[in-house]
Amino acid sequence: MAEITAALVKELRERTGAGMMECKKALVEANGDIELAIDNMRKSGQAKAAKKAGRIAAEGVIRVRIGSGFGVLVELNCETDFVAKDTGFLGLADEVADYALANKGTTIDTLATHFEDKRAALVAKIGENMTIRRVQYLEGDVIAQYLHGAKIGVLVAGSGSEEELRKVAMHVAASKPEFVNPEDVSAEVVEHERQIQIDIAINSGKPKEIAEKMVEGRMKKFTGEVSLTGQAFVMDPSVSVGDYLKSVNTSVTNFIRLEVGEGIEKVEEDFAAEVAKITGNNA
């Protein structure tokens, strides 16, 4: 039996909105597998929806650069928001982005090696760890970019109007689509969701045959919700992104979205407990 830690229960609560005891029970039944626990809770109705993305906890910045027929996003991380605004840290981020632009296709390992001396010197000066975490490129006939507060960066590739593609980039930043079109959703993802929806319907008392028919409509809604062109456009929710793009004679072939700290869990410290520990006052 896997150890069910308080941190694991806390993460499941945050991702499902369920109570502490329900989360602990689900984790025990799933032998500590949080993804399986989420699936089981959805099937039983305890969790109406579950976010699959990891918690965003690390600090840092995203930088974006546009070249000829391509764009690049880089992410640099640090430990605190204070350092994320430091001119030295921001200067390093800009240097890394400029290098990635000038050396198309460079890998994260190459960037880390090339800037190691500068990174180490800055760490020694500021006293906080820093990492060059990610670099991603996107090619296309037309490239548009959107940067939201240096925390979320988006590149969109397509054809037509760059101005319209930039609006779509803003939508991607806000709505977090996972695919371009509904038909792009992988068979594995579709089948996984279909089985969950069938179990939900059966658990509600529906016969299996009826449950399977009901799920077909839900699956169309699901693939639309996770795909860019199937989502309601944030600037005009009365139309889908796909319909809007058609109306402005523009199309999207691909996109990239990076958000600072995706998938990194930062240890949360109890400030009062830390002060008590330092002062020796545990009362």
UniProtKB/Swiss-Prot annotation:
CDD domains for the chain: UBA_EF-Ts (cd14275)
Superkingdom: Bacteria
InterPro entries in the record: EF-Ts_dimer_sf, Transl_elong_EFTs/EF1B, Transl_elong_EFTs/EF1B_dimer, Transl_elong_Ts_CS, UBA-like_sf
Residue span of region Involved in Mg(2+) ion dislocation from EF-Tu: 80-83
UniProt keyword terms in alphabetical order: Cytoplasm, Elongation factor, Protein biosynthesis
Cellular location(s): Cytoplasm
Residues of the signal peptide: none
Coiled-coil segments: none
GO CC entries: cytoplasm
PANTHER family membership: ELONGATION FACTOR TS (PTHR11741), ELONGATION FACTOR TS, MITOCHONDRIAL (PTHR11741:SF0)
Family: Belongs to the EF-Ts family.
Protein name: Elongation factor Ts
Originating gene: tsf
